[in-house]
Amino acid sequence: NNFWFDDGTQVARYNGEFRSSLLIDPPNGRMPAYTQQAQERLRVAAELRASRGAFAGPESRPLAERCLMSFGSSSGPPMLPILYNNHYQIVQSPGYVMILVEMVHDARIIRIDADPLPEAFRPWMGDSIAHWEGDTLVVETSRLNPSQKFRNATESFRITERFTRVS
């Protein structure tokens, strides 16, 4: 049913230029090749999945299928567009920003100018801490929950997102 698909009306714009890629680093917009270590992690993960079987238990099923997190990568980090339900509600209060994702209604809590959470604490969407650089909210996220590894990221995975109001 194509009614529900959210194709968008134009490609992404970055620094005033329309882009066909959401990657801004490297400048060519292409995903860098996997390192040897990443290729090995992918191979080991695939072997583990195959050895357990598709229905060995709930832990072998995707988080979205278990209604723990949104489908695709819309809840983030990083928050990337998917096929539909790409709307976000952003609410700011003293010390916090909350981003509510339309898809599955994930609520991402971002603390502003805060200290990191204890090392053992690993929320589903990671530990997001933000600060303002002028009109841009810069969000640094680390400590993703091991079950929510973004694209086979390691435990030391960190990501920086920048949110700027455009209108």
Task: Annotate each language-model stretch with its function.
Residues 1-167:
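PEST-like low-complexity, intrinsically disordered acidic/proline/serine-rich tracts
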